[in-house]
Amino acid sequence: MKSSAHDFAEAAERHLDDVHAFLVYLTGDRNVAEELTAETFARALERWRRYDPRRGSARTWLCQVARSTALDHFRAEERRRRRENRFSLQVPEAHEVVFGEGLSPELEGALSRMSAADRAVIALRVVLDLDAESAGAVLGISPTACSTRLSRALQRLEKEVGSGVAA
């Protein structure tokens, strides 16, 4: 189904904040999330003619593009780290990890210690309030698997918050 540039601009404007928030939670870094948000929308614009609203909402589709963009970024970072380690270069990570305005230090610390998969499902279901079907589509899993993953991620988050406070 063909969609116009106007439709893309409308969807981009409507869902920009959600995509950015998803990427902040996924990466744990506002600066990286901003770069990936720009890359996500550049990729989405190139692929917009393939978007079919009968297969899901624009928000879900854009989050799928964002997830793919983030995975590409993580793979590139891993390749970079391997190259640096191979040549014994020690390059410090100089970015600030910030998950969101108003989070307690305990919760922010707990989220930073969680896996990207756990942060992603929490961001999609809790922060962006996507249903299990939409979040599952973004993550490439069934709605049931998405609900299970969320439940387990929230249990791990609760343990992390408890261990962070006790430490």
Regions found by a protein language model. Give the residues of each.
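Amphipathic, Lys/Arg- and hydrophobic-enriched alpha-helical face
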Residues: 12-30, 46-47, 63, 111, ...
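Arg/Lys-rich amphipathic alpha helix in sigma70-family domain 2
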Residues: 46, 50, 64-86, 100
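Helix-turn-helix DNA-binding module
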Residues: 112, 116-120, 128-148, 155-159
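Structural recognition of an alpha-helix C-terminal capping motif at a helix-to-coil junction
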Residues: 35-42, 46, 56-68
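Internal acidic/polar
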Residues: 80-104, 131
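C-terminal edge and immediately downstream basic/flexible tail or linker adjoining helix-turn-helix-like DNA-binding
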Residues: 2-8, 101, 137-140, 154-167
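C-terminal flanking helix
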Residues: 16, 20, 41, 115, ...
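A short, charge-rich alpha-helical start-of-domain segment used by transcription regulators
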Residues: 1-21, 34, 45, 119
